[in-house]
């Protein structure tokens, strides 16, 4: 079967890999001049299945007003009358119940755990290199209230069989010695020993090279203009160079999936959430992080990537704006400086931003679309790197009409056959 994949971020390239390994002929269309040059370029670098949590949680309605007024707020909503933003915010608030939070988190963790298993298998098969470390992830709490709120997450982790360690202040420092000078800043932490770190850009570009060895045809610098449809099915993809045809089509366009599909009546619920990162060179090994640390207060991840530190996170609802705001840089520097002060060259760090494709439930859209021969693999939010391999593997199964490793009704595209059980249960 010939499959046309739209997009060459980490989701598109992993999708191409698993489709090619399943024996399909694969063509990848990408507007940039190479793989992983947009949202996958400089993300936080963490692969953290256990920390896969919905943004829509019971505490958000209470915390959001305080965040909006805080100097170093983890969330900023730029004033807008955009109907898509207002609809997305209302849908997210509807998911801020304990029942929906726990259900969505369980779906996310299941997919993320499966994805890590797929990544480990891929690494063993190929020997792919991407500054990978398997040293766990530590979520640090600056207040006792944050520590107490971790209880509901630990309950889900227990139910799903995910190992974890609840640590006091000294336990955190034992795992991350660089926190020694910040002992009065933290009260404790939650550590997941099975989590990993790695450079998503290096992984994606290396996997694209491996894909070529499997016969995948990458067509970089190709503008995707739209889908050609007739009789309820997709017949091709319009590009300036003509129509690209196949037997199946997979949309991996991240935050651009929603406007791309809207003319065909397909609503993914995906909205762009801007995140920022700094990439800094390590100047003092003893003060640097060993693996990934999550700063619960500022929603920032601080990750060791070889001889660099990646500081990433925050959330800004501002549509498709990609401007770099100095105030966001200041927040990243404040988080990293207060925990790993003197570890890296923050003033010379590279400042970057990207658009995460977020759904109101934080669960991605994977599987068949309402149009025949069309599939989606999008909406992974902040967890595209964590969920990439598993999402691609189950998507490849769906395209090939094989029984997937996970129940795809949990990630169904609205209006698709797989979404029917969810609609009836709603």
UniProtKB/Swiss-Prot annotation:
Top-level enzyme category: oxidoreductase
Listed GO CC annotations: cytoplasm; plasma membrane
Keywords, alphabetical: FAD, Flavoprotein, Oxidoreductase
EC number: 1.4.99.-
Catalytic activity: a D-alpha-amino acid + A + H2O = a 2-oxocarboxylate + AH2 + NH4(+)
Chain positions recorded as FAD binding sites: 3-17
Keyword Oxidoreductase: yes
Cofactors, names only: FAD
Pfam families: DAO (PF01266)
NCBIfam families listed in its UniProt record: PRK00711.1
This protein's name: D-amino acid dehydrogenase
Organism: Phenylobacterium zucineum (strain HLK1)
Lineage: Bacteria, Pseudomonadati, Pseudomonadota, Alphaproteobacteria, Caulobacterales
């Amino acid at each position: 079967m010939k499959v046309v994949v739209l997009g060459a971020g980490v989701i598109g390239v992993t999708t191409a890999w698993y489709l090619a390994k399943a024996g399909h002929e694969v063509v990848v269309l990408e507007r940039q001049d190479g793989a992983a040059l947009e949202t996958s370029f400089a993300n936080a670098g963490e692969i953290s299945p256990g920390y896969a949590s919905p943004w829509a949680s019971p505490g958000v309605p209470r915390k959001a007003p305080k965040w909006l007024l805080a100097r170093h707020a983890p969330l900023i909503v730029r004033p807008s009358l955009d109907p898509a933003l207002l609809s997305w915010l209302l849908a997210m608030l509807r998911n801020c119940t304990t029942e929906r939070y726990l259900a969505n988190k369980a779906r996310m963790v299941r997919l993320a755990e499966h994805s890590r298993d797929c990544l480990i298998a891929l690494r063993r098969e190929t020997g792919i290199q991407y500054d990978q470390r398997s040293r766990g992830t530590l979520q640090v709490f600056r207040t006792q209230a944050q520590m107490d709120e971790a209880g509901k997450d630990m309950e889900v982790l227990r139910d799903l069989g995910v190992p974890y360690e609840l640590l006091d202040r000294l336990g955190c420092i034992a795992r991350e010695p660089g926190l020694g000078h910040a002992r009065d800043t933290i009260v404790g932490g939650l550590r997941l020993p099975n989590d990993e770190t790695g450079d998503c850009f290096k992984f994606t570009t290396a996997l694209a090279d491996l894909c070529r060895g499997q016969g995948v045809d990458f067509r970089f610098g190709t503008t995707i203009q739209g889908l050609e449809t007739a009789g309820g099915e997709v017949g091709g993809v319009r590009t300036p160079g003509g129509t690209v045809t196949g037997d199946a089509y997979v949309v991996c366009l991240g935050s651009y999936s929603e406007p791309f599909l809207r003319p065909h009546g397909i609503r993914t619920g995906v909205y762009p959430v801007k995140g920022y990162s700094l990439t800094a060179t390590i100047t003092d090994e003893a003060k640097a992080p060993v693996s990934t640390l999550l700063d619960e207060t500022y929603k920032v991840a601080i990750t060791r990537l070889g001889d660099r530190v990646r500081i990433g996170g925050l959330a800004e609802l501002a549509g498709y704006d990609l401007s770099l705001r100095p105030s966001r840089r200041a927040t990243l520097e404040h988080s990293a400086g207060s925990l790993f002060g003197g570890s890296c060259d923050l003033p010379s760090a590279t400042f970057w931003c990207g658009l995460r494709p977020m759904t109101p439930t934080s669960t991605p859209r994977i599987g068949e679309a309402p149009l025949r021969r069309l599939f989606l693999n999008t909406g992974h939010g902040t967890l595209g790197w964590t969920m990439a391999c598993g999402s691609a593997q189950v998507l490849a199964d769906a395209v090939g009409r094989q029984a997937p490793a996970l129940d795809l009704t949990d990630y169904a595209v609205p209006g698709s056959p797989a979404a029917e059980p969810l609609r009836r249960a709603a």
